[in-house]
Amino acid sequence: MATHYSANQYQSAFTPKQLHCWSIPKDFKQHPSTHDDYTQFIANERGHLLAGVPRSQKNPWGTFLGTWDLPTKIPPSKLSLTSRSAEASKRLTNWIQNSEELLHACNGLQPQISGKASGKTDPPRDSSQGQQDPPVEESNKQTPLYRGRSKAESNRSSHRSVSSEKGGITAGDKVLQAQS
């Protein structure tokens, strides 16, 4: 054992002089004040509430939601409405506000919604059309461009690179003449 052991060996570190705390300490009561009324019993010796005592409607085990009590889809806890349409932001905020179980649980959702929704609304889509593109008239159709040229022009230029040694006519030109 230590030669200078005392029960207060760790207390000296917390003295005001050691902590450099020179403020005057607050006065406190030596003993707590007495309670004037009498204590009302609300339970019997077995711990059961007596008749006439109001019972709480809350669950005695609290509002904790376990894994199996959670809904299948949980809304996001941090939601930014900055780049969303008005319809999408309304749908997300309603989803959060309608999930009351999660909002009132002790381990539940504490949503943080930030940003403003854009004023643009998407036009409603018909469910019969699905997500198909609108029909394009024949006069408006254009051939896709390949590096600034149409597909036919790019085919011609690629065939010209292979040249025959006779007369300067390429094999690609012969094929194109035969096709037209």
UniProtKB/Swiss-Prot annotation:
Transmembrane segments: none annotated. GO terms for cellular component: apical plasma membrane; axonemal microtubule; ciliary basal body; cilium. Its main location: cytoplasm. One of its GO terms (biological process) is cilium organization. The keyword Cytoplasm applies. Residues 111-180 are annotated as: Disordered. It is found in: Cytoplasm, Cytoskeleton, Cilium basal body; Cell projection, Cilium; Apical cell membrane; Cytoplasm, Cytoskeleton, Cilium axoneme. The keyword Membrane applies. Pfam families: CFAP126. Keywords: Cell membrane, Cell projection, Cilium biogenesis/degradation, Cytoplasm, Cytoskeleton, Membrane. Belongs to the Flattop family. Microtubule inner protein (MIP) part of the dynein-decorated doublet microtubules (DMTs) in cilia axoneme. Acts as a regulator of cilium basal body docking and positioning in mono- and multiciliated cells. Regulates basal body docking and cilia formation in multiciliated lung cells. Regulates kinocilium positioning and stereocilia bundle morphogenesis in the inner ear. This is Protein Flattop. It comes from Xenopus laevis (African clawed frog).
